[in-house]
């Protein structure tokens, strides 16, 4: 489908999720944007390359889309891929609607290129196996090949890895600040005080809003970007 409608975009299947992650990472090192898609169990296979990509950093935007399967509709287990993102110390996004899934992808690439880190975008079965009309935007122009001339940080020898890891740790306050300013995190309009509130994310936020919590006097905090915002 992609090759038929956008032949300038290269897409392919890989032997497994680890090789897919490595291929996408290689394109990112060369300056191109890349997307790698897998299920939650595939994150186990890709874990080595995935975690190390946070330490090497990226050049062109790199987004990892992980589809989790709560209740095991078509999987051998349940996993929460957000723990992989937390362990790797990279930004995580979780859309609550089809429109948000579309919009978040562009945002994810911008965030990846700004922070020079891969971004994990997590979806779940009930969102992935659904349809909805979405408002589309103009296509992003492709970025040209632009290999980084300083390539030592792509090689994770211990001396380099220690330096890169320290850089990743130092970026964490920036990532928290980004979450605090994210258009996808925020409190629903609510006046007055309440004894009960709801914190929701992803498709669960949709389920909460279907019950019109505002009419019940219940404020709802929506959190769709991690690390968790810390400002009150």
Annotate the PLM regions.
Residues 1-98, 103-105, 124-126, 191-192, ...:
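Thiamine diphosphate
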